[in-house]
Amino acid sequence: MGKPARWLKSVLLGKKPSKSSGSKDKERIVNGKEVVVISKIEESDVVSDLSSIGNAAVYTSGIVETQNLKHEDVSDDEIQVSEVQPTDSQDVASVPDDSLSESEKIQQEIAAVTVQAAYRGYLARRAFKILKGIIRLQALIRGHMVRRQAVSTLCCVMGIVRLQALARGREIRHSDIGVEVQRKCHLHHQPLENKANSVVDTHSYLGINKLTGNAFAQKLLASSPNVLPLSLDNDSSNSIWLENWSASCFWKPVPQPKKASLRKSQKKFASNPQIVEAEFARPKKSVRKVPSSNLDNSSVAQTSSELEKPKRSFRKVSTSQSVEPLPSMDNPQVDLEKVKRGLRKVHNPVVENSIQPQLVPQIAVEKPNGSLEESVNAFDEEKEDEVAETVVQQPEELIQTHTPLGTNESLDSTLVNQIEESEENVMAEEKEDVKEERTPKQNHKENSAGKENQKSGKKASSVTATQTAEFQESGNGNQTSSPGIPSYMQATKSAKAKLRLQGSSSPRQLGTTEKASRRYSLPSSGNSAKITSHSPKTRVSNSSGKSGNKTEKTLLSSREGNGKATPVEWKR
């Protein structure tokens, strides 16, 4: 410790040490005004422990030599202290600053990676443990639920078996055999009854015992002791419910409902019976249309018009058919129709050939003759005035076609006077003429022609319409003209009427003395005039060179348009 003491003394006291002692440790360099102080640290004074670095700063172990120079010659700015140079041992152990930073960085990165890996592993292990616990919890809950469901199912099955046993036992006991056995046991063997009941009970609950004796069922029941088995109380309510349930016949199949389409159709026909009538009535109309289209091959336009207006033609036919049973009420229309049909028969010989082989309508034609004669006797006294007017008007229209207008007017006045004086004689004469001159063969031909022409359609219907219009305009007295002489009876008097017309041409201008003889022949001559005026001879004499078919069409068209009879020429 001598050297440091001396150094301290020299520093504190300012004394100069000797050269011998400080030559080794000190070096002074003085260059004019510059002073350089170099201090060396002895190797013995180097502290190896890093923890004593702080204490070494207070208690310096090195030797620092300072030389006080003259304050005048040296300033503070000129003093330079050299850096402390490390010893040789320090030079060997020292490392550059750049290399230390890179290594530290590498070490830090390695340490960070290890820390992160450890932390991530910890988190992964923690998550795995959590998931493992969750899976175990789920399995536990699911197992508990499954066992609970199995126990409930087992209890339900046991209850069903018990219910079936009770139902079967009750059914057996209430059956005829069971009642008889109970009665016999109750009367004769009382202890046997108790024994039988015990046997029945053991048999009824045998299935339950087998079911509960199963190992799996026992495990389920043991694992869930809180589950209570199903218990049935044998009360009155349960017995009533069992009876109702048995009475419902649940074992029978449910009846299938009928199809809704059949019900709807039945309701429709029940609510609307008119639909059924309409469906049955439609084919009848088609049947009526078929023969009407095949009658006249020459009149194509007329058949087309009939098809366009079927309702009108049907109404006309129905009215004509409805009039026939009552000839005394609507005789004028029927008479005119029959007259025109007879004329058409005479004019068309082809139609006669087609009508003659038909024998079926003849029977139907003969029937109205008796009814006509009977109706004449009933209505003669009531409608004499109407008969007189119609007898006057019928020959008037037919005579206009062949005679001038002046002669017609004079004839009207004479005929009216004659008929007013002797009406009863005229009716008697007509009845006698009808009975004498009746020829059934010709009547059948004419009536068959009338039937055929009635089906033909428009010609007969148009003629009837025009003639009815003419008689309605002339008066209401035309309804019962000569009720005892129908038109198909008058058409047979053509030969006799010709002779009467030839003989009655001159006596028209005679006095009243000859009126009585003419009066008796008026109805026959008038009725015959209808036919003879349109006979083939008169048609030939009065023809103007036109064909018969064209004249018929012109006659029909003129009567339909004007409603009055016009002079028409007939030709064969």
Curated annotation (Swiss-Prot):
Q: Where is the IQ domain?
A: 108-136, 137-154
Q: Where is region (Calmodulin-binding) located?
A: 159-178
Q: Which SMART domains match?
A: IQ
Q: Where is the composition biased (Polar residues)?
A: 82-92, 291-305, 400-419, 459-493, 502-514, 522-560
Keyword Repeat applies: yes
Renumbered to this chain, region (Disordered) spans: 75-96, 282-332, 399-572
UniProt-annotated location(s):
Nucleus envelope; Cytoplasm, Cytoskeleton
Q: Which cellular component terms (GO) are annotated to the entry? A: cytoskeleton; nuclear envelope; plant-type vacuole
UniProt keyword Cytoplasm, yes or no:
yes
Superkingdom of origin organism: Eukaryota
Output the InterPro entries linked to this UniProt entry. Answer: DUF4005, IQ_motif_EF-hand-BS, P-loop_NTPase
Swiss-Prot/TrEMBL keywords: Calmodulin-binding, Cytoplasm, Cytoskeleton, Nucleus, Repeat
Bias (Basic and acidic residues) ranges: 428-455
Alphabetically, the GO molecular function entries are: calmodulin binding
Task: Supply the PANTHER family for this chain.
Answer: IQ-DOMAIN 5-RELATED (PTHR32295), PROTEIN IQ-DOMAIN 30 (PTHR32295:SF261)
Family according to the record: Belongs to the IQD family.
Subunit structure, interactors included = Binds to multiple calmodulin (CaM) in the presence of Ca(2+) and CaM-like proteins.
Query: What's this protein's function?
Result: May be involved in cooperative interactions with calmodulins or calmodulin-like proteins. Recruits calmodulin proteins to microtubules, thus being a potential scaffold in cellular signaling and trafficking. May associate with nucleic acids and regulate gene expression at the transcriptional or post-transcriptional level.
Protein name listed in UniProt:
Protein IQ-DOMAIN 30
What species does this protein belong to?
Arabidopsis thaliana (Mouse-ear cress)
User: What gene does the UniProt entry assign to this protein?
Assistant: IQD30
